[in-house]
Swiss-Prot record:
Substrate binds at residues 215, 349-353, 878. GO terms for cellular component: apical part of cell; apical plasma membrane; brush border; brush border membrane; cytoplasm; cytoplasmic vesicle; external side of plasma membrane; extracellular space. It comes from Rattus norvegicus (Rat). GO terms for molecular function: aminopeptidase activity; glutamyl aminopeptidase activity; metalloaminopeptidase activity; metallopeptidase activity; peptidase activity; peptide binding; zinc ion binding. Keywords: Aminopeptidase, Calcium, Cell membrane, Disulfide bond, Glycoprotein, Hydrolase, Membrane, Metal-binding, Metalloprotease, Protease, Signal-anchor, Transmembrane, Transmembrane helix, Zinc. This is Glutamyl aminopeptidase.
């Protein structure tokens, strides 16, 4: 699964945090302030169309539980009170038939499950949620004899339906199985999980598509099942659907039947053994394009008919990366076909359902005439990510969700290898620094982080670990591991792992064992220190080659021994270092309490570069004079260091300064050379690294103008050099969008003028904005010259365009207006899915929070509408849980109190428990940081000529 859709692309905006403006009125009335009361200026009513009433299918109402076939019960007399399913019940095969009643927004179904029992029992239980059983379940012995059912009931605390037999059910042996048959009914509305319906417009006509999304615990919402990843079984799936629709599932079609004048039945081939979360089916009226893999497998992309041309790139990149992975993993893809389908309203970024991968449109469809280079890269990356899962996740699945990283960390790592193969000039093996390694190091330096392998025991905890630690830290430590044992042995170890656990489940220790066989290195001993405890070390260098380690934390006052870790927050570190262009690796074992001395033969003025290209998941701190030398070398000849090393120096220095381990003077001195910097990686990371300072002082009328002036001067040479013509290589286009956006952010008059000029010409219909500049033009054009007429025109264009990537950019433009009345209307539009799709609600809130006029409004709106959001999305929705992180830029005691009061009022955090911890910790750190650092930072910027 690709989850990172609620965050805007790095190419779209500076990922800086913004400080909320709280005026005297807000101070006075605190949390109960209404949006219109808490605004900073009065505004006349506008003419923007008011949101229409939500359509009926957005209701979260369930079918009536008539007849009480399996009534609710609090009976806890059996093992069903446990969160985990018992080991003695093992499903073997499902026969699943679903009838899709599109116009009624519901479906009916019947599932027959073949079950093995390893011990005698009278009770069977399996998962169900928000789906009703319409007939007393039927159970048959291996002989075919029907077993009398004493009763069935739903135990909703653990989302089970329990079936109790009148007689003992003897343990099975050999191929003998019990046969459990359940008839059920479900609703197609209310959310973007389970089996749901959404709509789209084709030539002015509203059409529907119904599809599933099951990871991690939503298969139980579609049909009764044993909904745990290690309960693998085979499936025969049939769909009965209106005759004007077609059907898809994991496997190819076996046969199609016409039932009558209105209905068809599509039956699919029997599947391989797979986990419930990978089961997928869809009913659609799409068209398709196809490629064929080198091994002869059909690779098909399904899209709306009017979007067919935008699927060409996805089809091409699929073939290139698919062929690469079949070779790399030395294992042929396991199914007869691989389909992809773009869902018009889709909750996650994409989902790797075996044989039928589902996508948000922004992640599959690319129009070379209308999409930006960043959009193209996003499509390639997500396609590659989901292709990795066809091996890591589908063929071999983690045994339980505590090892989620075996799926997502691996997909996040290998996606870069796949795209690098297909698009060799994109620098993808370096871009992993920008996309994964450096961003997640900030997350993992909080006390509220969590280990890569983490205990989870509720659906909310399961969904919450689909986060940066599982994805990006997982990818980062694999990158370090591959470099240590060599790429060739790493590849061999992956092949051993896939072969040994094909169609099975595995744990982290199983992967380590496979790599040890391939490399003859102590992989488990080293890597367990990176997966079983949170955080990472800072390696301190003294005397040029003596190194010690300690846990790196942003909060300098935090107790580094907490929460307790059996490993004591020390790591076995593969220390890579370069000397005169030659690389070496020394494993620094945690048992060396006093540190180690690297075996280098340095000359008097030599420099030992520790962690070249930031290959290891740790930070490096040098002595003060070494930092001075690095700054001087950057200024005199920055090309002495690789672009990745320049990025690493800057990111480490600013993180160390934020943690009070380095003077800010040393970190800021590293930026003096930027007038000579021309490469994408360093500029992209500089913009991110300094964004914390920018956000903390954005409301400081004395200091912020000095910050703006300095960075305007630093970015001007590269901005002038690149200009506003959308030309050059893929990387050049990404660089141009980043530096021009940064120039606009820093108030550069020429850049803002160009953005406004392009925006105003677009408003008049005179000119099309270059595709790679559209986001920053929509954003800064709206910010600087946007009025109500401009805002309404932008909204109209959003509603007219069919390309999802263009819609996303226009949503950001709408969020950038300074008119707070329009922002208030925009927030209320989030309640109308006819205007703003359900998938985009949290994206829009986050976009508004990036607006200095909207950041407090977005937070206030969340508080005022929390009950509505919980009712619409459920408390276990990971995107709802994470939306509280828009408050990360807050830095006052009042704002902290408001957050604490809000969380106290709504103590049930669901999937947001960890994000709440993290945002509170961050805001407390911000408050302390300002007290400690304003003076020294002010002195540095004041001293600038």
């Amino acid at each position: 699964m690709n989850f990172a859709e609620e965050e805007p692309s790095k190419k779209y905006c500076i990922k800086g945090k913004h400080v909320a403006i709280i005026c005297a009125t807000v101070v006075a009335v605190g949390l109960i302030v209404g949006l219109s009361v808490g605004l900073t200026r009065s505004c006349e009513p506008g003419t923007t169309p008011a949101p229409s009433n939500p359509p009926p299918h957005t209701s979260t109402a369930l079918p009536p539980q008539d007849q009480n076939v399996c009534p609710d019960s609090d009976d806890e007399s059996g093992e069903w009170k446990n969160f985990r399913l018992p080991d003695f019940i093992q499903p073997v095969h499902y026969d699943l038939e679903v009838k899709v009643l599109m116009e009624e927004d519901r479906y009916t179904g019947i599932v027959s499950i073949s079950v093995n029992l390893s011990k005698d029992t009278r009770d069977l239980w399996l998962h169900i949620r928000e789906t009703r059983i319409t007939k007393l379940p039927e159970l048959r012995r291996p002989s075919g004899e029907q077993v009398p059912i004493r009763r069935c009931f739903e135990y909703k605390k653990q989302e089970y339906v329990v079936i109790q037999a009148e007689e003992d059910l003897a343990a099975t042996s050999g191929d003998s199985v019990y046969r459990l048959t359940i008839e059920f009914e479900g609703w197609l509305n209310g959310s973007l999980v389970g089996f749901y319906r959404t709509t789209y417009t084709e030539d002015g006509q509203t059409k529907s598509i119904a599809a599933t999304d099951h990871e991690p615990t939503d298969a139980r919402k579609s049909f009764p099942c044993f909904d745990e990843p290690n309960k693998k079984a085979t499936y025969n799936i049939s769909l009965i659907h209106p005759k004007e629709y077609s059907a898809l599932s994991n496997m190819p079609v076996e046969k199609k039947e016409t039932l009558d004048n209105d209905w068809k039945k599509t039956t699919f081939m029997k599947s391989v053994p797979m986990s419930t979360y990978l089961v997928c089916f869809a009913v659609h009226q799409f068209t398709s394009i196809q490629r064929t893999s080198r091994s002869g497998k059909p690779l098909t992309v399904y899209v709306q008919p009017n979007q067919k041309q935008t699927a060409e790139y996805a089809a091409n990149i699929t073939k290139a990366v698919f062929d690469f992975f079949e070779d790399y993993f030395a294992m042929e893809y396991s199914l007869p076909k691989l389909d992809k389908i773009a869902i018009p309203d889709f909750g996650t970024g994409a989902m790797e359902n075996w044989g039928l991968v589902t996508y948000r449109e922004t992640n599959l469809l690319y129009d070379p005439l209308l999409s930006a280079s960043s959009n193209q890269q996003r499509v390639a990356s997500v396609v590659a990510h989901e292709l990795v899962h066809q091996w890591f996740g589908n063929i071999v699945t983690m045994d339980w969700w505590d090892d989620l990283w075996l799926n997502e960390g691996f997909a996040s790592f290998f996606e870069f290898l796949g795209v690098n193969h297909a698009e060799a000039d994109w620098q993808m093996l370096s871009q992993v620094l920008l996309e994964d390694v450096l961003p997640v190091q900030e997350d993992d330096s909080l006390m509220s982080s969590h280990p890569v392998v983490v205990t989870v025991s509720t659906p909310a905890e399961i969904t919450s670990v689909f986060d940066g630690i599982s994805y990006s830290k997982g990818a980062s430590i694999l990158r370090m591991l591959q470099d240590w044992i060599t790429p060739e042995k790493f590849q061999k170890g992956c092949q051993i792992y896939l072969e040994n656990f094909k169609f099975k489940n595995a744990k982290t220790s199983d992967f380590w064992d496979s790599l040890e066989k391939a490399s003859n290195q102590p992989v488990k001993e080293v890597m367990d220190t990176w997966t079983s405890q949170m955080g990472y070390p800072v390696v301190t260098v003294s005397g040029k080659q003596n190194v010690t380690q300690k846990r790196f934390l942003l909060d300098y006052k935090a107790d580094p021994s907490q929460p307790p870790s059996a490993l004591g927050y020390t790591w076995n570190i593969p220390i890579k270092w370069t000397e005169n262009g030659n690389s070496n690796i020394t494993v620094y074992y945690r048992s060396n309490r006093e540190g180690i001395t690297l075996n280098a033969n340095l000359s008097g003025d030599g420099f030992l570069k520790i962690n070249p290209d930031h290959i290891g998941f740790y930070r490096v701190n040098y002595e003060a004079e070494t930092w001075d030398w690095i700054a001087e070398t950057l200024s005199s000849n920055h090309m002495n260091f690789s672009s990745a090393d320049r990025s690493s120096f800057i990111d480490d220095a600013f993180a160390l300064a934020r943690a009070q381990l380095l003077d800010y003077e040393k970190a800021l001195n590293l930026t003096r050379y930027l007038t000579s910097e021309k490469d994408f990686l360093p500029w992209e990371r500089v913009i991110s690294a300094v964004s914390y300072i920018i956000s903390m002082f954005e409301d400081d009328r004395e200091l912020y103008p000095l910050i703006e002036t300095y960075f305007r001067s630093q970015v001007k040479p590269i901005a002038d050099s690149l200009g506003w013509q959308d030309t050059g290589s893929h990387i050049t286009k990404l660089l141009r969008a980043s530096v021009l956006g940064f120039a606009c952010k820093m108030g550069a008059g020429e850049a803002l003028g160009n953005a406004s000029q392009l925006f105003e010409a677009w408003l008049k219909g005179n000119e099309s904005i270059p595709v790679n500049l559209r986001l920053l033009v929509y954003r800064y054009g709206m910010q600087n010259s946007g009025n109500e007429a401009a805002w309404n025109y932008t909204l109209e264009q959003y509603q007219k365009t069919s390309l999802a990537q263009e819609k996303e950019k226009l949503l950001y433009g709408l969020a950038s207006v300074k008119d707070v009345t329009l922002l208030a209307r925009y927030l209320e539009m989030l309640k109308d899915p006819n205007i703003i799709k359900t998938q985009d609600v949290f994206t829009v809130i986050r976009y508004i929070s990036y607006n200095s006029y909207g950041k407090s409004m977005a937070w206030n709106w969340i508080q005022l509408n929390w009950d509505y959001l919980v009712n619409r999305f459920t408390i276990n929705d990971r995107y709802l849980g994470r939306i509280v992180t828009i408050a990360e830029p807050f830095n006052t005691e009042l704002q902290l109190w408001q957050m604490q009061s809000f969380f106290a009022k709504y103590p049930n955090a669901g999937a947001g428990a960890k994000p709440r911890e993290q945002v509170l910790e961050t805001v407390k750190n911000n408050i302390e940081w300002l007290k400690l650092n304003r003076k020294s930072i002010s002195e540095w910027f004041t001293s600038m000529p």
